[in-house]
């Protein structure tokens, strides 16, 4: 059956609650400084799995039971966000939808780019994710061949990418009866709060003036322009589209070789590919000036002492990388290396007595950088490393054959975002780059031979 004629039939929709009640002394979870820094947003992803020959079909009842046990260990995720500062761990649970799809998995995976709004049918409802304080929502879609698609939304309230992957790896380890975790262990939500204590909640009026000190020098007749800039309110009329490109292992090796310099004699795979994507994107710009990227960096190993790798929270900070748009590839690499190398210092500042001032100072630097490049040339490169665990979410069917970090709509939160995922090809490790960019920029890349020499369209 063609994907255009497929039907996703909802079999059941329910709320999965923890298998055991959360102890009374853990019923109120106060978010850390790092959690407080970020406004909750809804993050989508869908993972596609083939059913290997000889492997039993998904046992939906066991999935529900293991998810219930997992929520006991990750108890704040079954609660409700009361504010930007507190989660009430009331065991209300998370939405769980079971659905059947009347076509083959392979036909959908081969035709992802033509699904359009049908991709949304694989996802659970978004209702209550922000306004209702729900942390996660899950939908399991079983195809006629026995393969399945596992789709979720999360709100980033108290989980970064590593925490989200750990949540799902815990669940799948229980389901597949692997021994990574003991069933009733409580996961570590305390390390991040101890390392990065929260700051007192602010009233909304106190948050508004953050950018007023960043106004440019006053010039006669430019009050309106100044107001526009200082309010961080840029207007973009262009249509944002999503595309995926593969950068295979051979191309990665060539980019590393091209990135070598005295300043960075041994660039990493990630540095070389990120610099290549950044340089390629800004090459579409017809104006000179500055550009910037934000790169989420895991702070767990950068804290003194380091935090456990399975500690839960938004334990990351964005490395702010700035450059002139006309820089060479090795110069982009050097900027990336330099900014990431400073993240240990940020971790130290956020742990000190002046952590609130440090948080505000970093935010002001970000706003200033965005203003300097007029917002248009500000990007996010978000790495989904294999080490973060997303490609290791294994229900006993093996690792996913495809990961798609979007539903049917490219929203404003994804604008100018590049999600960089590792994959294994016949020659080694490569990258898949999901790019959410202005349509004009995508068209430029799709017709640029210098870009296509290293990247091949995949969606």
From Swiss-Prot:
Record-annotated active site: 156 (proton acceptor), 394 (proton acceptor)
Biotechnological applications: Soapwort saponins possess anticancer properties and are also being explored as enhancers for endosomal escape in targeted tumor therapies. They may also serve as precursors for vaccine adjuvants.
Recorded metabolic or biological pathway in which this protein acts: Secondary metabolite biosynthesis; terpenoid biosynthesis
Tissue: Mainly expressed in flowers, flower buds and young leaves, and, to a lesser extent, in old leaves, stems and roots.
EC numbers, comma separated: 2.3.1.-
Keyword field contains Cell membrane: no
Keyword set, alphabetical order: Acyltransferase, Transferase
GO BP, sorted A to Z: saponin biosynthetic process; triterpenoid biosynthetic process
InterPro entries associated with the record: CAT-like_dom_sf
One Pfam family here: Transferase
Statement: the UniProt record of this protein carries the keyword Transferase: yes
Domain of life according to the entry: Eukaryota
Any GO MF annotation of the entry: acyltransferase activity
Role of this protein: Component of the oleanane-type triterpene saponins (e.g. saponarioside A and saponarioside B) biosynthetic pathway, leading to the production of natural products with detergent properties used as traditional sources of soap. An acyltransferase that catalyzes the transfer of an acyl moiety to QA-triF(Q)RXX to produce saponarioside B.
Record family assignment: Belongs to the plant acyltransferase family.
PANTHER family for the chain: F21J9.9, VINORINE SYNTHASE-LIKE
Oligomeric and partner information: Monomer.
Annotated protein name in UniProt: BAHD acyltransferase 1
Source organism: Saponaria officinalis
């Amino acid at each position: 059956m063609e994907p255009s004629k497929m039907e996703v039939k909802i079999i059941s929709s329910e709320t999965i609650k923890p298998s055991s009640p959360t102890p009374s002394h853990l019923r109120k979870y106060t978010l850390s400084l790092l959690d407080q820094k970020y406004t909750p947003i809804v993050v989508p992803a869908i993972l596609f799995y083939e059913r290997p020959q000889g492997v039993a079909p998904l046992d939906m009842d066991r999935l529900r039971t293991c998810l219930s046990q997992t929520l006991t260990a990750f108890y704040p995720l079954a609660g409700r966000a009361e504010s930007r500062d507190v989660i009430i761990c009331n065991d209300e649970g998370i939405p769980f939808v079971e659905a059947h799809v009347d076509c083959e998995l392979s036909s959908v995976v081969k035709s992802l780019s033509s699904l359009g709004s049908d991709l949304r049918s694989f996802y659970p409802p978004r209702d209550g994710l922000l306004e209702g304080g729900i942390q996660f929502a899950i939908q399991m879609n079983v195809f006629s061949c026995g393969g399945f698609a596992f789709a979720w939304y999360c709100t980033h309230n108290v989980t970064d990418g590593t925490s989200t992957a750990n949540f799902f790896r815990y669940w799948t380890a229980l389901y597949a009866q692997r021994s990574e975790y003991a069933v009733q262990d409580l996961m570590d939500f305390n390390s991040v709060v101890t390392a990065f204590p929260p700051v007192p909640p602010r009233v909304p009026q106190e948050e508004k003036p953050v950018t007023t000190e960043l106004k440019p020098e006053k010039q006669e007749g430019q009050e309106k322009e100044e107001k526009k800039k200082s309010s961080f309110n840029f207007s973009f009329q262009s249509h944002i589209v999503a595309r995926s490109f593969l950068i295979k292992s051979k191309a990665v090796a060539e980019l590393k070789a091209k990135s070598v310099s005295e300043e960075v004699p041994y660039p990493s795979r990630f540095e070389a590919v990120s610099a290549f994507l950044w340089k390629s994107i800004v090459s579409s710009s017809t104006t000179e000036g500055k550009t910037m990227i934000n790169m989420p960096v895991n702070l767990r190993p950068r804290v003194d002492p380091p935090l456990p790798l399975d500690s839960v929270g938004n334990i990351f900070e964005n490395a702010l990388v700035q450059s002139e748009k006309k820089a060479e590839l090795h110069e982009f690499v050097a900027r990336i290396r330099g900014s990431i190398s400073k993240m240990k210092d940020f971790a130290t500042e956020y742990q000190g007595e002046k952590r609130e001032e440090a948080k505000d100072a970093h935010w002001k630097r970000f706003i200033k950088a965005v203003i300097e490049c007029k917002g248009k040339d500000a990007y996010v490169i978000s790495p989904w490393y294999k080490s973060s665990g997303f490609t290791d979410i294994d229900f006993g069917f093996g690792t996913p054959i495809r990961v798609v970090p979007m539903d049917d709509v490219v929203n404003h939160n994804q604008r100018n975002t590049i999600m960089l995922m590792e994959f294994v090809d016949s020659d080694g490790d490569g990258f898949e780059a999901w790019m959410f960019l202005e349509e004009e920029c995508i068209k430029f890349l799709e017709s640029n031979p210098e870009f296509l020499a290293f990247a091949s369209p995949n969606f």
